[in-house]
């Protein structure tokens, strides 16, 4: 087990962030917050779909349209649908997140995060505290069922079991639970198989405290978030598709906006 401040037989702790060019600022805020709070060296890399397609790690097919929603205002808002299972998805990283064990060479620990988040605490705490080798991964095991029918970019909201478990995943990349899991699975398995983590036994999935994936509009307001997740959209969608539903949501939104201002002033 890793001891505090001991990474002698591991790479520098690494975070892979789901990247969508429409949310570049969100990615940059997350990266900025990670480095701002980190107590030591840390890598933060975006998972860019165009790059991983180019090197042959990803070939999942998708199509535009087929939505029963009103016509969107621009092409960027047209519903994306997966050609394998016909289900809607909303971002470039809906499935590419599941490549993290392979991107990390099937060894050591690596963290995946959606881009619509920001740290309020030291991200290295995750690597120091949650590294029991009996687990193939850790996540916050949310019981989350959104009430909205439409999400960002006018896409349909789709509910499924274990929703938001896959938005923060700390992978033990060399764990035996991944031995039958392949790069090809990421391009060919149904989205529900991937997001429900069905290549793993339930006992292989460790639990992170909810403050590491605090969901706006859902998580307890009195829980002091270490990582805030704007799963309903975020302050960069103010006056479009997102608004706070609690004082805590607004407080965290203002913190995010302050980080965005810091980036713009650099």
Residue ranges with predicted function:
Residues 23-24, 119:
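Alpha-helix N-cap/loop-to-helix initiation residues
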Residues 1-22, 28-29, 39-40, 46, ...:
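A glycosyltransferase accessory/donor-loop signature
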Residues 61-97, 102-104:
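Short, structured active-site "lid" loops
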Residues 95-145, 170:
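GT-A fold catalytic core of metal-dependent nucleotide-sugar glycosyltransferases
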Residues 10-11, 36-41, 103-111:
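Short, solvent-exposed loop/edge-beta patches enriched in aromatic
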Residues 32, 36, 128:
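Short, well-ordered alpha-helices that flank and scaffold nucleotide-derived cofactor binding pockets
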Residues 128-194:
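Conserved catalytic core of nucleotide-sugar-dependent glycosyltransferases
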Residues 86-88, 98-99, 124-127, 151-158:
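Short secondary-structure capping micro-motifs at structural edges
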């Amino acid at each position: 087990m890793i001891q505090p401040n001991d990474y002698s037989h591991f790479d520098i702790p690494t975070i892979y962030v789901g990247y969508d060019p429409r949310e570049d600022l969100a990615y940059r805020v997350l990266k900025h917050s990670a480095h701002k709070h980190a107590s030591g060296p840390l890598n933060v890399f975006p998972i860019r779909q165009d790059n991983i397609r180019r090197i042959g790690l990803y070939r999942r097919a998708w199509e535009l349209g087929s939505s029963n929603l009103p016509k969107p205002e621009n092409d960027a808002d047209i519903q994306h649908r997966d050609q394998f299972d016909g289900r809607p998805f909303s971002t470039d990283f809906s499935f590419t997140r599941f490549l993290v064990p392979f991107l990390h060479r099937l060894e050591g620990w690596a963290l995946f995060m959606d881009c619509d988040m920001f740290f309020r605490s030291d991200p290295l705490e995750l690597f120091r505290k949650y590294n029991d080798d009996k687990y193939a991964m850790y996540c916050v095991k949310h019981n989350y069922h959104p009430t909205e029918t439409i999400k960002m970019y006018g896409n349909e909201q789709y509910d499924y079991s274990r929703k938001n478990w896959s938005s923060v995943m700390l992978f033990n990349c060399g764990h035996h639970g991944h031995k039958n899991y392949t790069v090809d699975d990421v391009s060919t398995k149904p989205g529900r198989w991937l997001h429900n983590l069905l290549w793993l036994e339930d006992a292989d999935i460790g639990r992170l405290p909810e403050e590491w994936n605090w969901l706006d509009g859902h998580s307890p307001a009195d829980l002091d978030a270490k990582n805030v997740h704007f799963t309903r959209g975020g302050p960069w969608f103010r006056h479009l598709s997102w608004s706070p539903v609690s004082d805590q949501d607004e407080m965290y939104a203002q913190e995010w906006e302050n980080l965005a201002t810091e980036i713009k002033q650099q």
